Amino acid sequence: MALERTFSIIKPDAVKRNLIGEIYHRIEKAGLQIIAAKMVHLSEEQASGFYAEHEGKPFFEPLKEFMTSGPIMVQVLEGENAIARYRELMGKTNPEEAACGTLRADYALSMRYNSVHGSDSPASAAREIEFFFPESEICPRP
């Protein structure tokens, strides 16, 4: 099977609680490589652009408010079946339904403050990666 890329966010709630290192450790332990990463503080305009598909939905404004409330870590992950593998590691969106040992079961505070985001399809991964990273900032590892 070919290598696949996915996009990941460590959200403001997890950054604030100093969970970046623990989450990175678990990503790498799951067999995924971090091939690009940076810390950013989203502007309202950036958050609106990134979450444009949700505009008009009841959770859009609270989501933007949360995602602009503090710095986030954005990263590109690479590995076999990276999208499915990272989604399995994250667990269900609602931490109460997430399996034990998943990132959300272990670190999420609530459904809104659920610590991490991951792309749900190859098309989403490509769009989300391109939103934050020019190809020159992505460094595949052997």
Swiss-Prot record:
Ligand binding (ATP): 11, 59, 87, 93, 104, 114
Any one Gene Ontology BP term: UTP biosynthetic process
GO CC term, one of those recorded: cytoplasm
PROSITE patterns per UniProt: NDPK (PS00469), NDPK_LIKE (PS51374)
Needed cofactors: Mg(2+)
One example GO MF annotation: nucleoside diphosphate kinase activity
Enzyme Commission code: 2.7.4.6
Pfam family name, one: NDK
Domain of life: Bacteria
Keywords: ATP-binding, Cytoplasm, Kinase, Magnesium, Metal-binding, Nucleotide metabolism, Nucleotide-binding, Phosphoprotein, Transferase
Compartments (UniProt record): Cytoplasm
Catalytic activity from the UniProt record: dZDP + ATP = dZTP + ADP; a 2'-deoxyribonucleoside 5'-diphosphate + ATP = a 2'-deoxyribonucleoside 5'-triphosphate + ADP; a ribonucleoside 5'-diphosphate + ATP = a ribonucleoside 5'-triphosphate + ADP
Top class in the EC scheme: transferase
Pathway: Purine metabolism
Principal location listed in the UniProt entry: cytoplasm
Record flagged with keyword Transferase: yes
Record-stated family: Belongs to the NDK family.
Self-association and partners: Homotetramer.
Function: Major role in the synthesis of nucleoside triphosphates other than ATP. The ATP gamma phosphate is transferred to the NDP beta phosphate via a ping-pong mechanism, using a phosphorylated active-site intermediate. (Microbial infection) Catalyzes the phosphorylation of dZDP to dZTP, when the bacterium is infected by a phage that produces the substrate for the synthesis of dZTP (2- amino-2'-deoxyadenosine 5'-triphosphate), which is then used by the phage as a DNA polymerase substrate.
Official protein name in the record: Nucleoside diphosphate kinase
Organism expressing this protein natively: Vibrio cholerae serotype O1 (strain M66-2)
Gene: ndk
